[in-house]
Amino acid sequence: MTRIKLSYFTIGLVALLLALALWPNIPWRNGQEGQLDQIKARGELRVSTISSPLIYSTEKDTPSGFDYELAKRFADYLGVKLVIIPHHNIDDLFDALDNDDTDLLAAGLIYNRERLNRARTGPAYYSVSQQLVYRLGSPRPKSFSDLKGQVVVASGSAHMTTLKRLKQTKYPELNWSSSVDKSGKELLEQVAEGKLDYTLGDSATIALLQRIHPQLAVAFDVTDEEPVTWYFKQSDDDSLYAAMLDFYSEMVEDGSLARLEEKYLGHVGSFDYVDTKTFLSAIDNVLPSYQHLFEKHAGDIDWKLLAVIAYQESHWNPQATSPTGVRGLMMLTRVTADGLGVKDRVDPEESIRGGAIYLQRLMKKLPETIPEDERIWFALAAYNLGYGHMLDARRLTKNQNGNPDSWVDVKMRLPMLSQKRYYPSTTYGYARGHEAYNYVENIRRYQVSLVGYLQEKEKKAAQHAAIEAELGKSNPVVGPGWSIGD
């Protein structure tokens, strides 16, 4: 998975030109009520989607996801309320569109020519490749000719179109089946669990799921990069499309689209099986000893984020000591510990409390111009590198015409702090900026793993409890001296 190759300037220019070209076809100019008028009259933008960590998910009733946030911003742009309509599979999405039960589909859908008979597409907002996956430990196929097992893909997915084309053009013996009951995410999970031989997925979703299911392995790329886009109803009315183009153009111009892409996709590129497997094992075997302390002292920080910071620092080893003298779960220096009132750096609770306080102080110290949802990454860079060096990275960003308040811009300048071409001109001099870059990226990856892994455990526990409850109804416990029918 990589970012769209086109420059954001090009996207914005194309959006503007298309909007101008569509101007004559906007219905309100002819006295008709168009799609956009209907949405505004209703006061709601109905968006159909599919549950997935990347697309749309909820934790404690708080929604998140790339498509969700983008749709929420579009609804705000239109001045209406966002109504999310989750569906289980892609066929249901397009049926809802056909039946006028939704206004647009925002579900990480790959651009597909076959779908153009049923729907229109909006602008692309990121790109992915289609990949064939298998379970690690099984023989790795190098092409479709090497497959020795069953291939199943989600019904209605772009993967079906791809497989049909490959069968017609290159692999006449290729066979597969489609599943109506299982979503693409569920099929990927089945491969990871050894319940299915192969399936196809998009590179972004696979990269995220590997953080939770490290046994999920990529055999090969099936396609080149393809755009991901929204879909909406076919119509001669261009009002909604024109509004969408204006919205995307604005998102590109102010950098919001790049920041959103960074938030959900900027840290998922590299995958280390051993590191991920080791971390998931530590969640089961080590984290329970300290979880209550992370929850107790997290304050305004998500306890899970505080926990993964500690893992990045010490691998949850309270006795950890570095060659430079930092110690404990949160790897505090003596000077920092003294300033926080931490008397014993290897005491787990003192270390966690001190680290949480220090991080919150850094967040409050940051310039107010930094967006709320990006402040934590700047604070973590300062936690690792030092506040002054983080400010140097912001200055470098501004001097190079980047946005010093955007993490996606600043993180790319962190490695420059160790390069002779740049650090002599900084206020605080040389710093291992590349280490701070990796530090923050690792924490973000661990956070994806921890949040997703705990959600999976909760889901399985709930399913197990439901099964137990059902079995209890079927086989009621009979006390001594009682019989069924008494």
From Swiss-Prot:
Secretion signal span: 1-21
Cellular location(s): Cell outer membrane
Chief location: membrane
Keyword Signal: yes
Region annotation Non-LT domain: where it falls in the sequence: 22-268
CDD domains: MLTF-like, PBP2_YfhD_N
EC code(s) of this entry: 4.2.2.n1
Database matches in NCBIfam families: PRK10859.1 (NF008112)
Record's comment describing the protein's domains: The N-terminal domain does not have lytic activity and probably modulates enzymatic activity. The C-terminal domain is the catalytic active domain.
Name recorded for this polypeptide: Membrane-bound lytic murein transglycosylase F
